[in-house]
């Protein structure tokens, strides 16, 4: 497995792409209300990416994906396709996944949102998904084997009586949307690449309130939990630095530092 070490010039461009992707999530929050369609949200994000930020949606047309962002509601694990016929309801939990291209380089991030008041279970699931990502980010530094990321995520999620989806993983990112390495969200010691300064990849755990099994719908994209349980996901693009990592898609309202320094 060959992992691309980014040059300083590439890192500079990816900081810009990551910041832009994060800004889309910051912008869209106020628009997420009951009775708004997912296609409305898709169009708002598309216009912001293309016309305001002069960038490109990495999702639109990727292997035939028909929209500019992914919107996954409740039991949808990932790759939900926005539609005029799908409207938000009070109590929904929603993942919005943003991937953009700016000056030839990608930025990729996602987070969960609540539509109005939601259940205690929904909030707890989202909290554990977010915390599992943050715990893994605190591990990232040169010299760490990649499987440690999946190990800490799986241990934390399962200790909270939730389950980790194993069919989908994080990935290297740069000029290409998906590069090496594959970043698993569960422990697998075969995933033993040693992290090095200059690597850039996503960490994006998907966790379910029920069983971990998933199924792909007839549209070829939408992935749901088999048991119809709720699912939640958070995602960041991260750069391995000398002593830790920089979160390239950090958002202003996050309760974690943009720069995680792990000297010990």
From Swiss-Prot:
Highest rank taxon of the organism: Bacteria
Metal-binding in keyword set: yes
Chain sites annotated for binding a divalent metal cation 1: 97, 108, 235
GO cellular component: cytosol
Cofactor(s) this protein cannot do without: Co(2+); Zn(2+); Mn(2+); Fe(2+)
Key words, A-Z: Aminopeptidase, Hydrolase, Metal-binding, Protease
Gene3D superfamilies per the UniProt record, alphabetical: Creatinase/methionine aminopeptidase superfamily
Documented EC number(s): 3.4.11.18
Catalytic activity as recorded in UniProt: Release of N-terminal amino acids, preferentially methionine, from peptides and arylamides
Pfam families membership: Peptidase_M24
BP terms from Gene Ontology: proteolysis
Matching HAMAP family: MetAP_1
NCBIfam families linked: met_pdase_I
Name of the protein in question: Methionine aminopeptidase
Annotated organism of origin: Buchnera aphidicola subsp. Acyrthosiphon pisum (strain APS) (Acyrthosiphon pisum symbiotic bacterium)
Gene name as annotated: map
